[in-house]
Each structure stands twice: as C-alpha cells, then as structure tokens.
C-alpha cells in the first residue's frame, strides 16, 4: 500500500483528529492533498472544521467546569490571563472567533473563554463560525501551496524509505552517544 492510498483512505479521519488541538500543519497538508486530488476540498474543510470545533468545545467546557482551578496553576502568567479575560468581556464575539487565529492561544483561548463564564448559547455558534472560517482559510492556503510542492510530492514514495532510514540512523547514533556518555559518568562512581 502506497502513501497516496493511505491518504485517500484515512485522510479525513486524520484531519479530524489532527485538528482537535493545534492543527494548522494538518490543515495545510489537507489542502495540499486536495490539490493533488487525493481528498476533496469541501470534505477537507468540513473535516478540519469539525475537529477544530470539537476540540475547542471540549476545552471551553473544561474551562467552564475547572477554569478557576486551572488558571490558578499559572500564577506567573496572571497578568496575561487577566488581560485576555478583559478582552473576552469587552469583545466576546471577536475573541471567540479570533482565538483560533492567535498564535499560542489555540488551546488556552477556549479554556479562558469557558472560565469567563461566557454562556454556551453564545460560544457554540461562534465556535462553529470560527472553525469554518479557520478551516477554509488554512485549507485554501494549503491548496495554493500544493502547486508549489507538487513536483516534489510525486516522488515522495520513492524517497520516503530513504528519509525513514536516515531518521532511524540519526536516532540510533544519538541514542548510542547518550548511552555511552551516561555509562561513562557511572563508571567513576563504581570505582570510588
């Protein structure tokens, strides 16, 4: 079974799972796969939006349920948390939709929104809207980028095994060096 067959068979499920938390890379790759004809563009957008929406909904509910307890654990970031909570109070609609576009806020954003006690009837439709906007934008970028890397992708199957072997050799060399270094540090302790 080649890589293209795997992508065609399991691509949509991988997109849903991959976009549950961060997901920009997965979404871009979904767009590339759509450009290559391995996946259908509308289904890529739908899969990515679904994964992003589910992930953010779970984080929102965790924030709503455990928000105070969770946020107290990040005492050194209290000023940033308070600033974000003020933004949520002033511009809840923009914050809910925009949090998925803010670097570093994709996971903590929905949790903060839940902790702010924004009602679910407001969060859910905004979450759906934001998820579809985010999915459409990043899938489109991936689709456009697919043209740039298309020539390289056609030879990916031929070169994939070489990359896998290279990675395995690097991991093996690093592992052996670490083991020898650790073994060398233990030796003097046994002689003393």
Curated annotation (Swiss-Prot):
It holds the Pfam family VTT_dom. It is a multi-pass membrane protein. It comes from the Bacteria. One of its GO terms (biological process) is FtsZ-dependent cytokinesis. Residues 1-40, 143-159 are periplasmic. The keyword Ligase does not apply. It is found in: Cell inner membrane. The chain crosses the membrane at residues 41-61, 122-142, 160-180. GO terms for cellular component: plasma membrane. Residues 62-121, 181-192 are cytoplasmic. Keywords: Cell inner membrane, Cell membrane, Membrane, Transmembrane, Transmembrane helix. Belongs to the DedA family. This is Inner membrane protein YohD. It comes from Escherichia coli (strain K12).
